[in-house]
């Protein structure tokens, strides 16, 4: 589920380990509100989830862990479900590692495939069947 708001630092610092987020992409690729849709629309063959410490920016926090899977041939609902399951499993493991002191957060490499995925509006993201350049109409519904 996308939230799309930037929380103030005072709130992010309240929990003992900070606020932890599950993001449905391999950050820093596809930061933002619609990473799954953008992965489908740009023809990615693999994507995944990132467990990260939240920061004041939009999906800019340090990363604790990532896991990937093949996404070719899946539509949005199917992929969303697969990534949610993968994210839940990785979150449990990562939280155990954070609590035990085994986890180490890694700064996102801004030079490594940084992309921003804005909101997926009905007419801007293929949801309204608009064709993207050099793309067949992917089934993101």
Predicted features along the sequence, with ranges:
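Alpha-helical oligomerization interface recognition
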Residues: 1-50, 54, 60
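Active-site-proximal loop/hinge segments within enzyme catalytic domains
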Residues: 56-141
């Amino acid at each position: 589920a996308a939230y799309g708001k930037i929380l103030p630092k005072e709130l992010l610092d309240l929990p003992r380990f900070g606020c932890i987020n599950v993001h449905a992409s391999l950050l820093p690729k596809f930061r933002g509100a619609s990473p799954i849709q953008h992965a489908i629309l740009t023809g990615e063959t693999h994507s995944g989830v990132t467990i990260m410490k939240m920061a004041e920016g939009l999906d800019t926090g340090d990363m604790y862990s990532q896991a990937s899977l093949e996404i070719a041939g899946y539509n949005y609902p199917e992929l969303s479900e697969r990534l949610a399951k993968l994210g839940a499993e990785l979150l449990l493991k990562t939280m155990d590692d954070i609590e035990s002191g085994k986890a180490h957060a890694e700064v996102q490499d801004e030079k490594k495939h940084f992309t921003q995925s804005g909101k997926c509006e009905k007419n801007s993201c293929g949801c309204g069947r608009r064709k993207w350049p050099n793309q067949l109409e992917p089934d993101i519904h």
